[in-house]
Amino acid sequence: MSRIDLRSQSLDLLRFPLAVVVLTIHIFSTEGITFQGTTSNFEDYPFFMEVNRFIDGFFRGQSVPIYCFISGFVFFLGVEMTKETYIRKFKNRVKTLLVPYLIWNLFAILLLIVTICSPFNQYKAHPAEFTPSLQGFLSAFWAYHGQLEGTIIEDSFPLNQPLWFVRNLILVVLCTPFIHYLLKRTRYYLVILLGCIWFFSPLFHIRTYLLDVTFFFFVWGAYMSINKKDMLVVFGRFFKVSVILYIALGVVHVLAAHYYPDLTGIIKRINILAGLLFAYNLSAWLLKNGICKVNAFLASASFFIYVSHGLISGKILKLAYVAIRPASSISLLVVYVSVIIITVGLLLLTFYLLRRYAPETLKVIAGRK
């Protein structure tokens, strides 16, 4: 395998696992389930909460920075950035980012309306009421504040929450001419500046809509691509260090969650940096040693899983919880793991059926070229 193929396949190998990690994080973020006005508090399940802290320490916040880095690297890879190139790439991103973003948020709005109008709404502790408004409709595509259901939510995410990454990526892509111009003149200083803003932004309690993380990692990837940096060489130098740091910081984050919770934010940011190097180095190592290879189907399904899982995972979790009624940490953990497997399985099946019987529809909703 050539170095170019190894670099490309190392990125492709990461796509599906990263999507599953995002799904897992979103499912395990649900630490209490309300049914018929009664909320189950999972603090009563100590082993389950320890597993949750482990997932927080090792996986939360890791996937999207890697996605951003890959996006920045690929955007500028192997092309001369002329006016015609930008126009072509912008047109492509309309198909691969903007159209799916609009469609999947519309799906979320429709699902919200169906949920509010369904008979099950009356079993909620505080039944929602559909209150249509232009402001509420538009907020669903940027930062949804609950207007469509007559409530107030302080949030930085669109209605289909995982799509914040796509929203931010659209904005970053629009800035790529300026990013290219600045990188050509400032080189890595722009990367360092954006890295500092990302690293220290929590100290200032400013709502960034997560644009800090998107810009930093996209620009970092763009810098390496524009300057023809070989990731196999640059990241490979830190293989052992990244493994040690990633594991050590994950453990430290779990311990800090118990004893020094104020430090978890800084620890997590350092671990995100180590995690990026670790993930790419591990992917390249697995391929180079023939331990695994890229599954084209899973890699191509990763974006579909990412944009769609938020619409069904929470509902599947609630159904599974109500059906099983777990009475211990182990049984609760079994419920959560089962929901991850069921959700991934259903979405892969849906992707397969769409690819086989409605490929044109899949191209539109999944941003496939």
Where are these regions (language model features)?
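Membrane-interface helix-loop-helix regions
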Residues: L97-N168
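Solvent-exposed interhelical
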Residues: I170-G195, I206, Y223-V241
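Kinked, hydrophobic transmembrane alpha-helices enriched for aromatic residues
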Residues: L6-F42, S63-F75, K95-I116, L171, ...
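Alpha-helical transmembrane segments and terminal signal-anchor/GPI-anchor hydrophobic tails
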Residues: V219, I226-F297, A301-F304, L311-Y336
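Perimembrane loop-to-helix junctions flanking transmembrane segments
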Residues: G37-R53
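Interfacial loop-to-helix transition and helix-capping segments at the boundaries
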Residues: N52-P65, I153-N168, S201-V219, H253-F278
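Membrane-proximal cytoplasmic C-terminal regulatory module of class A 7TM GPCRs
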Residues: R356-K369
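Structural signal for the C-terminal ends of transmembrane alpha-helices
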Residues: F75-K83, I116, P177-R185, S201, ...
